[in-house]
């Protein structure tokens, strides 16, 4: 049924028969490559995924071991490039050597992840690596203040992208907070000004960049609002703060009664990825917290609860959902699963929501079991794949760095059961429009 929904939306709703053909052709070519001896390690990985999933459940390595392996992989992904950026990811079937060039967008928000990790675990090497990333981002920033879409490219090949700019702005905010170096504040202010000028009268960002569909404004761009609001507070810029709130108000105009958001995918908005659903929910929630907007937080809770309730018995989530929250893909988008868990853990941290804690833990239990802590190819060890199975429909056949980034964020979340046991949640903001979550005993 999930595959039937995917085909229906691909052919009849999105009208993308050509894209569907090329996706199948690319999948066929990747499977053919797996027969070649140089890809033996990945072929073994593909053949043994289900067996290993059960073995990981039986072994149950500690979260500390998983977290350390994931952080080590990000460090390896940075070292795999000739600059201080982080490789887009490891895709042995797609490029010689497996490693793609540095990717400005996700290097940007990895800065925040690594600085948080460095502070929590007293890792000066990770702090230095993160600040080097922030310096590199400033070096490749476009004259307009924007950040380029796609992997790093020479100036004459760069095209600006609002979303990518927002994610690097997030990194510059964190780098400035950690170092108080003026160059990070200057780069961030330039990026924030680009984002403000890129917004239309309705509050939507206009510049998608060259690597996503151009026919619509993207709801998930509202995540830029969080970084904009952070910079507004650092720079004392009220205009920027108003723009951040307007970006989320615009996104909420596209939320349906079910909690689902329209125009919310890289390329197939009738069945968005959990990846872009996660981006939107994080943006709505975090701006709601900083701006003290209970309506934003309630909207995020509604969407988050609706999608997390759709998890399968093993904790996995379908990679795509239609407007009625019907599963529309049979693969799991592991990135999106981690992102949704991150937002859920933030809800629990601030508001003490036990039901969301249970749901997020189930999702992360599945994702953890897909992580390899040993193997013949060290470039796979510690990373999280784009999809489960790895030849599924998101970032097929490889390990995008942002999947591991959100895995780290989820595992490094506060020790939530301890916080809950101590009593009152941290945040005193009252959710006047939130309805109670469902009773898990009924699911």
Task: Tell where the protein language model's regions lie, with residue ranges.
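Glycan-recognition and catalytic cores of secretory/periplasmic carbohydrate-active enzymes
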Residues: 1-443
